[in-house]
Amino acid sequence: MARYRHSRSRSRSRYRRRRRRRSRYRSRRRRYRGRRRRRSRRGRRRRGYSRRRYSRRRRRRY
């Protein structure tokens, strides 16, 4: 029971914080939405490539 109560309070605080942030930085998000999307896509692609390459090298070595 104690555990359940703790998790419930945590989720409540998180929801409140998220709501406030959205209302505050709504205009900013609209302005830099394209830039953020492009950055995230590039980072994901680069990370995936490096991981695959490193895994292949390690396998060959071992």
Curated annotation (Swiss-Prot):
<keyword id="KW-0744">Spermatogenesis</keyword>
<keyword id="KW-0217">Developmental protein</keyword>
<keyword id="KW-0226">DNA condensation</keyword>
<keyword id="KW-0539">Nucleus</keyword>
<protein>
    <recommendedName>
        <fullName>Sperm protamine P1</fullName>
    </recommendedName>
</protein>
<dbReference type="GO" id="GO:0003677">
    <property type="term" value="F:DNA binding"/>
</dbReference>
<dbReference type="GO" id="GO:0005634">
    <property type="term" value="C:nucleus"/>
</dbReference>
<keyword id="KW-0221">Differentiation</keyword>
<dbReference type="GO" id="GO:0030261">
    <property type="term" value="P:chromosome condensation"/>
</dbReference>
<dbReference type="GO" id="GO:0035092">
    <property type="term" value="P:sperm DNA condensation"/>
</dbReference>
<comment type="function">
    <text>Protamines substitute for histones in the chromatin of sperm during the haploid phase of spermatogenesis. They compact sperm DNA into a highly condensed, stable and inactive complex.</text>
</comment>
<keyword id="KW-0158">Chromosome</keyword>
<dbReference type="InterPro" id="IPR000221">
    <property type="entry name" value="Protamine_P1"/>
</dbReference>
<dbReference type="GO" id="GO:0000786">
    <property type="term" value="C:nucleosome"/>
</dbReference>
<feature type="region of interest" description="Disordered">
    <location>
        <begin position="1"/>
        <end position="62"/>
    </location>
</feature>
<keyword id="KW-0238">DNA-binding</keyword>
<keyword id="KW-0544">Nucleosome core</keyword>
<comment type="similarity">
    <text>Belongs to the protamine P1 family.</text>
</comment>
